[in-house]
Amino acid sequence: IIAFLFISITTVQAQRRNARYNEYIKQYAPLAVEQMQRHKIPASITLAQGLLESGAGYSELARKSNNHFGIKCGGNWRGRTVRHDDDARNECFRAYRNPKDSYEDHSDFLKRGARYAFLFKLKITDYKGWARGLKKAGYATDPSYANRPITIIEDYELYKYDSRGMSKRDARSWEKELKKK
């Protein structure tokens, strides 16, 4: 009976997580595709990072400050801020008016950061190279960070959005397809 209860609870938690992830993907995939078109960052990477860093939109940072990527203030940030406990207590994080601003700033953050420049030499469909490169460049402190986005990308087939991000026409038809689901 205990084993059955454990399996049932685990299954319900996995389904809830899957539902949250699927809802996040449905809601934010168009933004990730748009960012890919504008900045040449794989949509799969942007979505996987958003899912990870925001807890599929349920983290305190995402809910209270629209920060979907866990980006800290840094020395040159002049926008809104929020305090949050992370690696240390009461750290400064960027705050945004809406999720779209967070997605745009994430792209700008990667494009402007010299430590990420080598990533833009990778193929746009090389999500594994991007994930490993983000870890190598110091995007996150988690030692297993590179594997986490790769697993999400493969489990949720986010790599499909990378090819859809190639043209604006494809993105529009894809958005119509998403709305039908």
List the model feature ranges, each with a label.
Residues 3-13:
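Hydrophobic h-region of N-terminal signal peptides that target proteins for export
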Residues 12-181:
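Catalytic cores of secreted/periplasmic lytic hydrolases that degrade extracellular macromolecules
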